[in-house]
Amino acid sequence: MKKQYVFFGAGFWGQSLLQYIPREQVAFYVDNNEQKDGTAVEGIPVRSFKNARDELRNYKVIIAVSNQYLFEIKKQLDAEGIPYETLQDVKTAAVKEKIARRPDYLGIYQRAMQWINKNNINGNCIINNTRVPKGYPEVTGYYIPTLLRWGYRDLAASFGKWLIDIQKPDGSWYDTEDKDPYVFDSAQILKGLVAIRKSIQETGFSFAYSEEELDKRIQKGIDWILSNMKKNGQLVTPSEAEWGDKRTCSEVIHLYCLQPIVEAAKLYNRLDYQEKVDKILEYYKEKYIDDILHFGLLSHFYSYVIEALVDLGETDLARKAMKTTEKLMGEIGFVPAYRDVHWCCSTGLFQQAIIWYKLGDLEHGDKAFAYACGMQNASGGWYGSDANPNYPDEVNDYISDAEVSWTVKYFLDALYFKNKADFNAQASGFEQEYPHTDGRYEVVKAELKENVIAGGMNVLDIGCGKGAYIHNLLKDVPEAKYTAVDISTKVMSFIQDEVVEKKEGSLTEIPYPNDTFDFTYTTEALEHAVDIESAVRELCRVTKSDGTVLVIDKNKSHLGQMEICEWEQWFDVKELQGIMSKYCTKVRVNQNVSYNGVSDGLFCAWIGTVK
């Protein structure tokens, strides 16, 4: 292998270059310390600049020294007319290459959203699958919390209206063909309607029906479900026609019906609802313990059961149950559709990822999530199942010839809970304090002071982390009222200032009504939002007209300057300015916000005045 490189700097930084360039390609080190001449680093000879000067033009020279000496050596080489790169140049190129090689994760999300846009019916409902393109009440129902979570409030409202419009007089809902009522389907619809009811309460969500009418419909639906409950706690659905055989699905999935009833019990102070939930839970835990512990159903339906246990607080039982699928994933690389096959149900795999994320198991969650993402079709959808080419005799018989609507929903949920689990895991690494002289903080403080309203103002820090900015602002701009929102309550627990209101939320689902805040800012958080336009729309929704939205984040032109997360994105200055301009009358950009004493254009500030 030809030796084509010379490293300038025979110290720590010079040695670190060997992470990026094979030693076989390095001719020698060069150093200004003449005492190092004739020594070696990692078996590579070291020469003094004085003795090596005339040969340097024959090689690619890379400067690898601390910032203290970097300018001096650049000047030295420039004077000799010797071209060079720096260690940072090499690092940046390596990170850029790594980013270019990673899967197109953001594209997976964008294609999934395009699939939803293409496969809903007039904005009223989601289809069953591409082979049966009719509205599916059950899935339309449990799409609603997902749409709200990702900031698609109008579509969620439209879905909710359609579901109330088609509710039967007895409170039930029927299947896709409008043939039979189902306890399970009705409960999934209630998940959506309860999510709307809670959003009305928290955010003033605009809905076609009055709160009174919505409350009436929700309670009527729950009363119908509970009318199918036996004294022992069993829920008996009027029809099981769509369930398939007992190997595929059984009534233990009724555990997945209980969460909306729990939420309704709180909303309406219905102790009788909670008492019946407790009885139903105990019945299915006792009657179906073998199926629960030993992966007794199709992974999609099995995951309904285990996620329900997590949501109902039965985490120990859920962890015990997941040992079976954990073992299978270790053996064949993914969770199979059934415990004794080698093909995969895409929805079940995303659901398994969700369960692991909710239990804080990122390792298994990420493995399941990545495998399921790889099954996405170019359309943005997923087939119900995919064959395993290593087992050609096995037939994947779960909707293998159509893209099913529910997989897209569970992909979006898995991505949300992945982000939440990631931030919980990283809690210890977040900054709790910033110097008052940090350029990013100075921009926030200056913009806030410029916009201070007589009598005080409401300020939102969204993606607040440990509240480092708020901590400083309480001292520097004490006349404002501060609110903190973050996806991780674990991270927010570090905010100890009692005057700060804290709520769990995300950039695409901020738990406040329209026009609540005078000044909204987010720093190094938009890069994690995935759906940037949805996040900007939400930032502007909760900010008053003529109020300020401030985004501080990284410039895409500097991509490669540091490692980034799988789902992270940096921003083209004009592109983000254009997105904000849809919701703001004017958007200013500061293209060089300093950080840690450095001003290199990595950070920008976009400042918008809301329409």
Residues covered by each model-derived region:
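Class I SAM-dependent methyltransferase SAM/SAH-binding core
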Residues: 466-509
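Glycan-recognition and catalytic cores of secretory/periplasmic carbohydrate-active enzymes
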Residues: 98-420
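A conserved beta-strand element that flanks and buttresses the S-adenosyl-L-methionine
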Residues: 521
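Conserved class I S-adenosyl-L-methionine
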Residues: 419-452, 472, 550-573
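A short glycine-rich, Lys/Arg-flanked "PGG" loop and its adjoining helix->strand segment in the class I
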Residues: 533-545
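Phosphate-bearing ligand-interacting subdomains
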Residues: 34-98
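Glycine-rich adenosine-cofactor-binding loop
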Residues: 3-19
